[in-house]
């Protein structure tokens, strides 16, 4: 069975998303993508839009744990309230969101692989523009 320390996961999804570099380390195990995010302040709104995600929102549900920092989540064009997950918290953010990292953050995520690949491919496209 596969196992790894978060900071030993392959950088940029083992080359699938080179622009992410060491800020997003991930590997696909079965139907899940295990990811470790280390980022400074980042608002993904424009990345989703420029990458061509439908409605400018992330289509991947995210399940995770925050080691430090925080993640703010908005749900555009819905009546869902914004959320803020902080250190020591586990989270689930359904598809249809925008992620905003208001401060340096380290988080471990377990995501459906296909859905995450669509999101990361879009972010890669946006970064290449």
Regions found by a protein language model. Name each.
Residues 25, 63, 90, 98:
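Short, surface-exposed charged micro-motifs
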Residues 56-73:
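Short, conserved beta-strand element in jelly-roll/cupin
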Residues 47-48, 119-122:
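Short, charged, solvent-exposed linker or helix-capping segments at domain edges/interfaces
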Residues 1-48, 54-55, 83, 129:
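A short, N-terminal "cap"/entry segment at the start of jelly-roll beta-barrel domains
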């Amino acid at each position: 069975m596969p196992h790894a320390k978060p900071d030993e996961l392959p950088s940029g999804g083992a080359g699938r998303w080179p622009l992410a570099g060491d800020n997003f380390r991930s590997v696909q195990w079965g139907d899940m993508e295990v990811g470790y995010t280390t980022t400074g302040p980042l608002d993904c709104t424009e990345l989703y839009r420029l990458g061509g995600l439908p409605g400018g929102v992330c289509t991947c549900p995210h399940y995770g744990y925050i080691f430090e920092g925080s993640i703010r989540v908005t749900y555009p064009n819905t009546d869902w309230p914004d959320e803020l997950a902080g250190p020591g918290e586990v989270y689930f953010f359904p598809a249809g969101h925008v992620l905003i990292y208001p401060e340096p953050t380290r988080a471990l995520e377990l995501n459906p692989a296909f859905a995450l690949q669509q999101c990361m491919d879009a972010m890669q496209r946006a970064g290449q523009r």
